[in-house]
Regions:
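Short glycine/proline/serine/threonine-rich loop/turn segments at secondary-structure transition edges
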Residues: 134-150
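Generic detection of short hydrophobic beta-strand segments and adjacent strand-loop junctions
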Residues: 116, 126-130, 164-174
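Intrinsically disordered, low-complexity Pro/Gly/Ser/Thr-rich segments with frequent PxxP/GP/PP motifs
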Residues: 101-138
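Short, hydrophobic/aromatic beta-strand segments
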Residues: 86-93, 105, 139-140
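Secreted, periplasmic, or luminal enzymes acting at the cell surface/secretory milieu
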Residues: 1-88, 94-98, 120, 147-156, ...
Length: 183
């Protein structure tokens, strides 16, 4: 599921159109706390977490192996089908960033990969490449910044079903060019 809903939705507030200043444009007043970033950061109960999906089988994640390069992080993990039926799994990698120059949500999706069909008792290796610039946040007056410090990668099948975590100490701080991309 690419979006999340709160478990209990109250009555929708109705306002006349005249009270809305953004008829011809959009004002994003919520900042970075949209969807799962808001729900996960503020520990709100949800009916369906971001990334949620059903399967007729169950999967087990081995501890990940992470390789850091100057411009990217490579995450490898073995996914095993522990159930009685064949199936596929969407493996998602979320990052928890250190405190820095910009306000940040609890975690953000940084990469994902779908396994091939895995039979019962079988497993496969997946690899997810996360470009280093995906760790950046926009800081007004400065630009796109990767804050230095320890990041935690959380690996699972949804934002709330985390199977493995790994800490990455010593991520160097970077200020990216105006386009937000590493050269």
């Amino acid at each position: 599921v690419p979006v999340k809903w709160l478990s209990m939705i109250g009555k929708k507030e109705k306002k006349p159109v005249a009270d809305r200043p953004n008829i011809d444009y959009t004002i994003y007043e919520e900042g970075i706390y949209v969807g799962y970033r808001d729900f996960d950061s503020h520990r709100k109960e949800v009916a369906y977490p971001f990334g949620y999906g059903l399967s007729y089988t169950s999967f087990r994640y081995s501890p990940p192996v992470v390789r850091m390069e100057s411009d990217r992080i490579i995450v490898q993990c073995r996914i095993s089908n522990d159930g009685a039926r064949a199936g596929r799994e969407v493996v998602q990698v979320y990052a928890c960033a250190p405190e820095g120059m910009a306000d940040k949500p609890y975690q953000e999706l940084k990469g994902f990969a779908k396994t091939p069909r895995i039979g019962p008792g079988e497993s496969c290796e997946i690899q997810i490449i996360i470009p280093m610039d995906r760790l950046s946040s926009y800081v007004p007056g400065t630009g796109w910044v990767v804050d230095p410090g320890e990041y935690t990668l959380r690996i699972g099948s949804s934002s709330r079903n985390i199977q493995q975590e790994i800490r990455l100490p010593g991520i160097p701080g970077l200020i990216l060019p105006p386009d937000g991309r590493l050269p």
